[in-house]
């Protein structure tokens, strides 16, 4: 029986490429500190930041990162901050020349020698734009790869621009790293409620038994952002909302929602089932997609997407999209799975909504459908909307809920941030929450025909919707077309998803 993956614990070397960038400043270094603060990153770990910017460690890198470090224990965490920065060194170097990487190798080997490391454990985090990713990967392999140890490489999205570019990237990476050395990170897989999906589904018989076409009428996966591109239009214009969040984040949620029970919770069993369900996804109907682009707010205070100076005034970039997936297998055939995502909407949230079929007619002439709602962010919660008799002498019914609100139920728990979870998983050698090469290939195969349809010269023109609205006017009709029953007739008090002043007894 083979042993599990090697855990990186004492005297691990972590190198963060792109250390001067926003991702490293706001996510990578704060995640490393969070793990250290909570005792999940050994103090013997050595962290190297590497970037082209000529920064000093004390005045520049530290001052950039410090405002983003969370200190839940107040002043008690100040000493942890100082200890953490003593673990960090910074190296300035180009990505396409050897000198900087030679210096990094020298510093790594010096540390490992002083720590009497026999089998090097090296984790490389590529917080880099796609344009330099392959260049750095080649330098890692030729200059700092642990030939007599274990190397792991965390890769940030985007993993390609379409199916052809993703395959080209995989082709170029193949000679450099084994699949088990690569950790393609999608941070949504580290979010607490996304990680909880398999337990909710398969650890509760009443949910597991009803999670199928016999009981569920429709499924929605929604991503809403209150803000627009805010000066990033030039970058977003070549990406669009589909590549930004749907081909990756939301599709990952969909696979966990719809996959079959794995034979075990080991990484490959989970990823095998994700691949199986992706293979059952029917091609997207390009004529059954709702596309939008935000215009000015109705009061004129917020600009339109094309008002961004970095965006072409004739841009047809999609900032809102809604589409429906059909999974051709025994569990899901006939159940529309709607995915929608947009910027500059009326609120910011990510949620999953499973609407159950209506009860048989008879004593109940007009009663709402049950819904299971999983709020990923903000204010993580799970609640089941169901019908109950209104208190009193009447036999009237009302919609109420059973709800699990994380902020009140788990007040005394440390709930790690997504990047903390995933970096920890990489250190442990756990691939469960990372994207495998065949999974990536199939996901691009699903979306690339739609992207080509949208981006051809005579492609569809997105519907303009006001900044701060719910999205294109056709959204309600689109949802109803795909079997979602609007609950407009039935008043409902949404559960409180923020901690209250008093704890439950």
UniProtKB/Swiss-Prot annotation:
Broad class of enzyme this protein falls into: oxidoreductase
Catalyzed chemical reaction(s): D-glucose 6-phosphate + NADP(+) = 6-phospho-D-glucono-1,5-lactone + NADPH + H(+)
GO cellular component, one term: cytoplasm
Phosphoprotein found in the keyword field: yes
Species, as recorded: Saccharomyces cerevisiae (strain ATCC 204508 / S288c) (Baker's yeast)
Family: Belongs to the glucose-6-phosphate dehydrogenase family.
Keyword Oxidoreductase belongs to the record: yes
Anything else known: Present with 15000 molecules/cell in log phase SD medium.
E.C. no: 1.1.1.49
GO process terms (BP): glucose metabolic process; NADPH regeneration; pentose-phosphate shunt, oxidative branch; response to hydrogen peroxide
Positions carrying N-acetylserine: 2
Pfam families: G6PD_C (PF02781), G6PD_N (PF00479)
Protein name: Glucose-6-phosphate 1-dehydrogenase
Active site as annotated: 249 (proton acceptor)
Binding-site residues for NADP(+) 1, renumbered to this chain: 18-25, 52, 157
Keywords, comma-separated and alphabetical: Acetylation, Carbohydrate metabolism, Glucose metabolism, NADP, Oxidoreductase, Phosphoprotein
Positions of post-translational Phosphoserine modification: 142
Gene that specifies this protein: ZWF1
